[in-house]
Amino acid sequence: MGEKMAEEERFPNTTHEGFNVTLHTTLVVTTKLVLPTPGKPILPVQTGEQAQQEEQSSGMTIFFSLLVLAICIILVHLLIRYRLHFLPESVAVVSLGILMGAVIKIIEFKKLANWKEEEMFRPNMFFLLLLPPIIFESGYSLHKGNFFQNIGSITLFAVFGTAISAFVVGGGIYFLGQADVISKLNMTDSFAFGSLISAVDPVATIAIFNALHVDPVLNMLVFGESILNDAVSIVLTNTAEGLTRKNMSDVSGWQTFLQALDYFLKMFFGSAALGTLTGLISALVLKHIDLRKTPSLEFGMMIIFAYLPYGLAEGISLSETCVFAFLGLSIFSFPHKFEISFVIWCIVLVLFGRAVNIFPLSYLLNFFRDHKITPKMMFIMWFSGLRGAIPYALSLHLDLEPMEKRQLIGTTTIVIVLFTILLLGGSTMPLIRLMDIEDAKARRRNKKDVNLSKTEKMGNTVESEHLSELTEEEYEAHYIRRQDLKGFMWLDAKYLNPFFTRRLTQEDLHHGRIQMKTLTNKWYEEVRQGPSGSEDDEQELL
């Protein structure tokens, strides 16, 4: 059934201060990616000139990828350096990718060089190398209190909402194709495309939310949905691909649905269990092995646990901003098949599927929520359905025949991603101000104070004021004991958190004070003994 498939798991993680990994790794459901394996288990070893050419090509590919990432880092630095905070980093990097792709295309057209293989973005590179730290950072910077307080709403939007959107988009594409309005796709291919295009990635929108200080509940609903939504979208896409690879000609529609449901549940809950188990093990390891005095070892252990579940899922068959540069490059890198009617109808279906997802579920949730989701918040949530790196990489990974169908899906996905990032993402800030979503303090801010840089805010959690001002002991004394927590929140605060996290001892506090005093004295001596009147030193002090 799954012998010819290798699967990859998305492992989210989040920690307390001091890099202690806790139970809260479950806040991002891990997923697997079904990747086709080679037909032969062992590839023949190449020698001679062919091996040398392959080695040179691999070296150039690595060089080109690192060069793109380095240029992206420099671009983000320049945005911060010159305070271009009004421009989201994802939009800037996409524009950079488009520019680089155009330059490479001109060079190839002039026959000065041929970098077609080197500039080609491989989906395996994204899922195996770039995706783990992206998901890890999302979980690491997430405030667990706000997340678990809204876990029911977030799960409903991420799981059922994504499924609704996938069925609406996939069903619409299938029936429009049968009516000869657009190119025909079979049911499984339509559902696969509907699933991959339902993965939201509101990077620019979250940056705007943080800059304008919108309602924390709105911020958390959009951010939390985007984390879990990616997982559900990947699993749904894998489910459709798994059905495509099977011989479904003699199977009824009801049996197909049951097989798809069985495949989805196994992947979804199996992935979540594997990610949770890995997170708990990492929490216990970091609790009982104190690596804080050796930061290099601590950092290495964190990287290992971030990547570990991916390799484990592969074996048992079970930085996002820079990715946008490859998305821009792909405009000129891949052969495209552009069909205007297909693109327009897909955009309409994506927006309609998002509306069918957000508005009915929000009205349903308001019957059970104390903090109601207002109509303005619903509209912003619908408008925040940007697409990003996940749909793009999944579209490259789809194994569709004939090739024209695959090119059509890939081209349409790129257009939808660029449409949502540039148009919807670019108009989110004026829309929020027009609808008066931001708080009173944010309205008094000057436009120059608005900061859309994700990098500058890296590591800052989305948190509530009544939680951010409390230490662990104060939180336990004033919040847990007084508020009478129930359900999982009580279980987490009472048992799981103390068991899986390491509290600071008096000895730790003593060593911390000594280290801080030593560093302060050292810094003071360096400043006092430095050359007086140096403009460089004065600039550093400023």
From Swiss-Prot:
It catalyses: Na(+)(in) + H(+)(out) = Na(+)(out) + H(+)(in). It comes from the Eukaryota. It is found in: Golgi apparatus membrane; Golgi apparatus, trans-Golgi network membrane; Endosome, Multivesicular body membrane; Apical cell membrane. The chain crosses the membrane at residues 55-75, 79-99, 118-138, 151-171, 186-206, 256-276, 306-326, 349-369, 374-394, 412-432, 446-466. One of its GO terms (cellular component) is trans-Golgi network membrane. Signal peptide: none annotated. The modification Phosphothreonine is found at T471. GO terms for biological process: acrosome assembly; proton transmembrane transport; regulation of Golgi lumen acidification; regulation of intracellular pH; sodium ion transmembrane transport. Its main location: Golgi. One of its GO terms (molecular function) is sodium:proton antiporter activity. The modification Phosphoserine is found at S532, S534. It is a multi-pass membrane protein. Keywords: Antiport, Cell membrane, Cytoplasmic vesicle, Differentiation, Endosome, Golgi apparatus, Ion transport, Membrane, Phosphoprotein, Sodium, Sodium transport, Spermatogenesis, Transmembrane, Transmembrane helix, Transport. It holds the Pfam family Na_H_Exchanger. Na(+)/H(+) antiporter. Mediates the electoneutral exchange of intracellular H(+) ions for extracellular Na(+) in 1:1 stoichiometry. Acts as an Na(+)/H(+) exchanger in the trans-Golgi. Contributes to the regulation of pH regulation of Golgi apparatus, and consequently, in protein trafficking and endosomal morphology. In germ cells, plays a crucial role in acrosome biogenesis and sperm development, probably by playing a role in the fusion of the Golgi-derived vesicles that form the acrosomal cap. Can also be active at the cell surface of specialized cells. Belongs to the monovalent cation:proton antiporter 1 (CPA1) transporter (TC 2.A.36) family. This is Sodium/hydrogen exchanger 8. It comes from Macaca fascicularis. The lineage of its organism: Eukaryota, Metazoa, Chordata, Craniata, Vertebrata. The gene is SLC9A8.
